[in-house]
């Protein structure tokens, strides 16, 4: 009986999710399929996916600082960002459910049964603006209450580089877990390396497992922290012109033993960094052969006319990421479909 109830609930949720499909979803599916016919790494991003991409690259957003998830028909608080408006209010707890959202001067909107991304879109907004949430506390028989929060710019620290120190025998080993090559990564790593130096670690491990890449510029600058100077990657455009991206500052921020952890989900910028460390003999690469993405994509908003003038008065059209270049290792090899082999 319990299994039947579980399956019935899941099927109902799947049917409801399909019924909530809108024209933007259909257009996005069609455009994505078209883009993938051009090459495997060319993508169309819907307006919401474009916003998500920008958030991941900048590690910041404007909102209330809460991670939400669906719980049957309810939008539930899964976690809160420390120091964010939701956490600071102390009026919201993990497990509470959001049943209504209201903007300043507008009526409360009932969001029970709504898609999660639609609820999120209502809650997010410019910093300094206010949003009213109708909260149904966790548990049975609870009564709703209204909580007013002022939106702020939130830095997503959980997606930034994380530092830890492990003790192995008598040695201290520093570990830097890098989930993505976001803008500002290299500066963050510099700070963490200084902390590790103060703790007298004997070696450093850089964990790039499940790191799908990010900004090419960050891959180059991060590599420069561990080599004196020299080329990091070669980039060839569609005209056959080759550009060399190099580290030129002559400064090494960490000179000790270095290990880079990779797996089959380490891709793009992760592969550039791992390949450079391998080609310079600077680090031991440990793990699985990487994904094998050796191309560079350019990001462009579809709200720009002729790629120049931004037209904010147009409805949001999303963006495209299209392949413009192919990159090569310092030794001249390509990672496309080959990856980096430990």
Model-predicted segments: where are they?
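Extended, domain-scale alpha-helical bundle/helix-rich regions
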Residues: 1-63, 67-72
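Conserved functional hotspot residues or short segments at active or partner-binding sites
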Residues: 1-9, 328-342
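Cleft-lining beta-strand/loop regions that shape enzyme active-site pockets
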Residues: 19-22, 45-61, 70-88, 94, ...
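Short beta-strand or tight-loop elements
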Residues: 62-64, 129, 318-320
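Short, mixed charged/polar active-site loops
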Residues: 141-146, 317-319, 334
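Pro/Ser/Thr/Gly-rich intrinsically disordered low-complexity regions
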Residues: 293, 314, 321, 336-342
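Short acidic, Pro/Gly- and aromatic-enriched capping/linker segments at domain boundaries
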Residues: 310, 314-327
